[in-house]
């Protein structure tokens, strides 16, 4: 949460800085603690209550400045509602969340001073960093702030983080894939709590030099990462020794995976896009990787659909697997398909089972020109719209798939049809 919106004065030029500073100091003097601490509003039925989310003694400040926001981590019994003292706060911003059974991590790209000069910004942009804040969590105790740390580079998503046996593993990307002077590459950093700090104890770099990180998955003593620019290097990481992680396997294939999902100890599914050897994207691709030999990963099977994508590429919640059956929502613009496909995984193969379409009989395509009237849209927002312009006509060529019964290809006001098409 951010502090309450105070009416700060921002100087318009260097000569007004002193005046703005004096005004803002007076504004601060007039504030109360409630203006700076996180607040809550609880709505229950027809009643509403408000209050302070956390007392001051439960707010912490990292050793290094991490922003003006307050990160609040709460532990509470839903049946009892929110109560004061049920959590902890840290003066920092937050973007990405990952949780183990007893630790809760929040990461964010490092805050930048707004007054930084252009030269300093250029130098800073070459060395992005990520702040990480750790909290202890438990069933019977409120969340507690534990430690903070910094790693070089930017974080892709929550699957780039994982905790195993007290060690936090995190994959970040440094540099830029398009800057020849400072080419990007990804790295895996292992961190350990010491006092109130997350300290680096292990590192392996060199993942995808000159490429961007597209997906990652860290599981116990093994990790997987996919980078891409023209081809897809699929990396296997040995995490058995947290002090000496290592890249032990690499596979170069066309396309890339943006979501990796383990099927069993020997197989991983990749959801992403197929591509040419030059990096031109072709459509949806599902890959099956055999990782039984960490030093020799293999893509044993693929399933593709041209000109298609899946929400599962961006949101893992759209991916479903039941035993050996994968259910994947798919949208294809060339085949005009919108629905889900069922794939069977087994014996190193991906087998197409069937599909479920989301189209209905009410959306059968038409290919004629027809008049759209207010009667057709009675009771909808389009009724007034059509009456105002004296009706509309739907224009579709006979060879086109046309619009649908509840939509249109191109709608032209009848009163203006001559202006568009003459006779």
Report residues per predicted region.
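Beta-sheet-rich non-transmembrane sensory/scaffold domains
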Residues: 1-423
């Amino acid at each position: 949460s951010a502090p309450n919106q105070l009416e700060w004065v921002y100087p318009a030029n260097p000569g007004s800085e002193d005046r703005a500073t004096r005004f803002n100091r007076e504004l601060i003097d007039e504030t109360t603690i409630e203006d700076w601490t996180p607040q809550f509003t609880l709505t229950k039925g027809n009643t509403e209550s408000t209050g302070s989310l956390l007392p001051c003694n439960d707010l912490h400040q990292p050793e290094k400045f991490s922003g003006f926001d307050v990160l609040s981590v709460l532990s509470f019994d839903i049946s009892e509602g929110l109560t004061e003292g049920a959590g902890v706060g840290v003066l920092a911003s937050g973007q990405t969340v990952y949780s183990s059974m007893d630790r809760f991590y929040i990461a964010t790209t490092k805050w930048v001073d707004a007054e930084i000069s252009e030269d300093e910004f250029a130098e800073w942009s070459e060395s992005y960093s990520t702040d990480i804040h750790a909290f202890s969590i438990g069933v019977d105790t409120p969340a507690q702030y534990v430690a903070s740390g910094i790693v070089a580079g930017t974080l892709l998503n929550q699957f780039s983080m994982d905790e195993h046996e007290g060690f936090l593993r995190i994959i970040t990307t440094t540099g830029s894939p398009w800057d020849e002077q400072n080419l990007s590459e990804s790295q895996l950093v292992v961190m350990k709590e010491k006092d109130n700090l997350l300290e680096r104890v292990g590192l392996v770099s060199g993942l995808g030099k000159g490429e961007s990180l597209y997906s990652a998955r860290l599981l116990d003593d093994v990790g997987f990462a996919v980078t891409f620019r023209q081809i897809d290097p699929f990396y296997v990481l040995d995490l058995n020794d947290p002090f000496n992680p290592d890249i032990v396997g690499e596979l170069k294939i066309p396309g890339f995976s943006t979501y990796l999902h383990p099927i069993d100890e020997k197989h991983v599914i990749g959801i992403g896009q197929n591509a040419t050897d030059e990096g031109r994207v072709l459509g949806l691709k599902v890959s099956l990787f055999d990782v039984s030999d960490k030093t020799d990963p293999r893509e044993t099977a693929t399933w593709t659909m041209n000109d298609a994508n899946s929400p599962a590429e961006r949101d893992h919640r759209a991916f479903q697997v039941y035993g050996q059956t994968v259910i994947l929502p798919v949208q294809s613009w060339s085949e005009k398909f919108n629905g889900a496909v069922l794939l069977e995984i087994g014996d190193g193969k991906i087998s197409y089972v069937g599909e479920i379409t989301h189209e209905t009989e009410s959306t059968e395509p038409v290919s004629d020109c027809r008049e759209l009237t207010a009667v057709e849209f009675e009771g909808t927002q389009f009724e007034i719209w059509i009456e105002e312009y004296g009706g509309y006509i739907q224009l579709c060529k006979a060879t086109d798939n046309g619009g649908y019964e509840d939509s249109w290809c191109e709608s032209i006001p009848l009163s203006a049809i001559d202006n568009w098409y003459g006779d």
